[in-house]
C-alpha cells in the first residue's frame, strides 16, 4: 500500500524507463560524494549543459540543449539532490521544460560502496518525457536516456580518475 505522507520519488513516475549500471571510481567515497555535489563537476558531466547555477533557495538551475532523435530542444529546469541517506545513497533529479518540444525529467538513484581505495558507484537512471518528445516513441527515448546517463557517469569517472580535467571557467583564449 502507499503511505499517504510519502513524498513522490522518481520511482513513482509514470511512463518512465529504468536503466542501471555500475562503475568503479579510483577515489574515496567521501570524495566521490563531494564531487557529485560540486557544481563545476556536475556541469561538466551533464550532457548538453550550458549553464548550471545555484539559486538563492539552494536549488540548482540548469540550461541544457539535447537532441532526441530529430528534435533538438533547449530545456530550462532545475536539478535537485536528495541527500537524506548520504553519502551511501542519494539521488539526483532534474526536470526541464523544453517549450514546444515538451518536457523531460531525468534522474538517478546512486548508491556508493567502498572497495579498498576505490568506490563502486551503482546507479539506476530514470527518465520520463511528455509533449512532443514523448511522441517520438519509447524506444528512441530509452536509448537516448541510456546514452545520456552513460555519458554523465563516464565523464564523471574520467574527471575523478584525472583522465580529464574540468573546463576552465575563464573565456577560452584563441590558440595560435
Residue ranges and their predicted role:
Residues 18-24, 59-61, 74-76, 89, ...:
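Intrinsic-disorder/low-complexity, polar/charged segments enriched in Ser/Thr/Lys/Arg/Asp/Glu/Gln
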Residues 42, 69, 98-101, 129-130, ...:
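Short beta-strands and strand-coil junctions in structured, solvent-facing domains, enriched
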Residues 54-95:
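Glycine-rich portal/gate segments that line the openings of hydrophobic small-molecule binding cavities
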Residues 21, 50, 76-83, 106-114:
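Hydrophobic/aromatic beta-strand elements that line small-molecule binding cavities or substrate pockets
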Residues 13, 96-143:
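Beta-strand/loop substructures that line and gate deep hydrophobic ligand-binding cavities in soluble
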Residues 132-174:
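A conserved amphipathic terminal alpha-helix motif
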Amino acid at each position: 500500500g502507499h503511505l499517504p505522507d510519502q513524498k513522490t520519488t522518481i520511482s513513482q513516475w509514470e511512463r518512465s524507463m529504468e536503466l542501471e549500471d555500475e562503475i568503479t571510481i579510483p577515489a574515496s567515497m567521501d570524495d566521490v560524494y563531494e564531487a557529485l555535489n560540486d557544481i563545476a563537476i556536475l556541469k561538466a558531466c551533464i550532457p548538453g549543459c550550458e549553464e548550471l547555477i545555484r539559486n538563492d533557495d539552494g536549488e540548482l538551475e540548469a540550461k541544457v540543449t539535447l537532441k532526441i532523435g530529430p528534435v533538438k530542444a533547449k530545456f530550462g529546469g532545475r536539478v535537485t539532490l536528495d541527500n537524506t541517506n548520504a553519502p551511501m545513497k542519494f539521488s539526483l533529479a532534474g526536470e526541464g521544460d523544453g517549450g514546444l518540444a515538451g518536457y523531460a525529467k531525468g534522474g538517478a538513484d546512486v548508491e556508493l560502496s567502498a572497495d579498498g581505495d576505490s568506490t563502486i558507484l551503482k546507479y539506476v537512471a530514470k527518465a520520463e518525457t511528455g509533449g512532443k518528445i514523448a511522441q517520438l516513441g519509447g524506444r528512441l527515448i530509452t536509448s537516448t536516456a541510456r546514452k545520456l546517463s552513460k555519458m554523465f557517469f563516464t565523464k564523471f569517472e574520467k574527471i575523478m580518475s584525472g583522465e580529464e580535467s574540468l573546463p576552465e571557467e575563464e573565456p577560452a583564449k584563441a590558440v595560435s
